[in-house]
């Protein structure tokens, strides 16, 4: 029977180990705190929340154990009458010994069962009392932990409400434990009068039982013969061997249960990790979607700007085409004007050469005329002398005078003819001067026209080289005109008409110079404008290149975003498949565990039935009606094992069967099951799969 007491101790230790919550419960409480507050809590507040969740789980365990102990008290209440009848019979037997030994054995067996159950109830009540004291200390420590955070708002209020609820539930549980303790003390008071031999001593020979360690049942059975002792010892050995086998099986089942719990914990961790991965993938997908929308907006803006720039470029291209056409026209006109200028230059050179030749000819003719005048004067003087001599000789010679008159008349006619020739030459020179003046006027007008055309050409954007060549031509023409003016001034010294024409030519040349300067200024302005236009065109071209590059980058980013979308969609699909497989595996694992637990419970029931049958067969084999049967030992051990197995496996049975059983026995009793917590995980996984599939469908529709 020492093995039985050791078995009781192991069961109580396992029950105490079951008080410690699983790691997943703390994580669930932490996520619940996050969902309630909507923000990340302080680590001390979160640790206090974890303590409260542990306390709530321990409260659930205590309430469940109280329900089981209430069932035990009900059984003890039903057996109390049997115990009282046994006590009364013992007292009567002490006064008058009876001959019915079988009834005495049955009553002694029931009394021993009552004693064992009352001691079990007492030990369990003590354990619950110590556990409630520990939980009270935990609640006080949690209150001390959250007391510095009174100004944190909603988190503190939620934890304060949880603390108040736990204190209220603790008070209710303490009241129930006190009532249970009173009942167990009453039962212990009744069973304290039973001595070690199973006889009633009237309360004088009561032996205290320490922490669930009971006396040996073999010492409590009154054995009278050696055959009975041998049979009992054999039965005890068989029962001990079976009990050892059952303990081995139970330890193996516990090991398998722990392994399954570890597997469930690892699967829960995998599920949590997959949930985090799916959340990260979903957040990345949302970020990619937002980035794609931003890129779409920027691409639309860039496309609008590009359309505006293309419109401006088309306008600028049209303007450029117009300017090019105007440039071509102006080039053609300039070439025509250059041809005209070349012709004018050639004509000016010819005129200058002609004027130089004319001036030289005029100078030579004037010199000849002067020489002729000198000769004429000398001839006149000689003639006058001759006339005087002839007059003197006329007197002398009359015939000679007539001859002299004839010769003098001829000379006079010759002189008059020479004068007329000189006058004709002067008229010709005057006509030539007038022609030069008219040509100068024509040149002035042509220069004005050329200056205007040069200004127009410079406004239209001609090159500096052409303008420099034109200026050189103008300077050459100016020099030629100056030479002509110098020649005309030299001729004007002798003729006022030539002086007036030369002065007019100088005025015209000065006007032309001023106009040329103005034209040069205008040409510089037009060149600056052309430079500005070219710079603006270059800037526009650079902006076009930049925007084209930005467009290409935007298209690349859009392609990358679409590729990321496809990748994330594929990843989400793969994760969804993995999650579905995990959920199916979890469901299959849960069903397998449930089936295994039901099979174990059935095997335990079968073993209990077999034990009962073995006890009955042993009693039949004894064949001696006066001897005591080992049925009491087997029934006590089977009842004890059944109660312990019920306490260990009650948290793993089907929640619906437990609810129906508890309602039929006690009423409406609240129960917490591990399956309910697992069902939450399954629902969360299904919701995550639905959300990811909906997001994938929406993304495909948007694409």
Swiss-Prot record:
Disulfide links within the chain: none
Its membrane topology: Single-pass membrane protein
Comp. bias regions, Basic and acidic residues: 1-12
Coiled-coil region(s): 118-183, 236-265, 318-461, 500-604
Biased composition (Acidic residues): 92-107
Transmembrane segment boundaries: 679-699
The keyword Transmembrane is assigned to this record: yes
Tissue expr: Ubiquitous.
GO CC aspect terms: nuclear envelope; nuclear membrane
Sorted UniProt keywords: Coiled coil, Membrane, Nucleus, Transmembrane, Transmembrane helix
Region (Disordered) location: 1-27, 86-107, 189-208
Localization annotation: Nucleus envelope; Nucleus membrane
Biased composition (Polar residues): 198-208
PANTHER family linked to this entry: WPP DOMAIN-INTERACTING TAIL-ANCHORED PROTEIN 1
Job description of the protein: Together with WIT2, required for the nuclear envelope docking of RANGAP proteins in root tips.
Subunit text: Homodimer. Component of Ran complexes at least composed of WIT1 or WIT2, RANGAP1 or RANGAP2, and WIP1 or WIP2 or WIP3. Interacts with WIP2, WPP1/MAF1, WPP2/MAF2, RANGAP1 and RANGAP2. Component of a ternary complex composed of WPP1, HSP70-1 and WIT1. Interacts with KAKU1. Interacts with WIP1.
Protein name according to UniProt: WPP domain-interacting tail-anchored protein 1
Gene that encodes it: WIT1
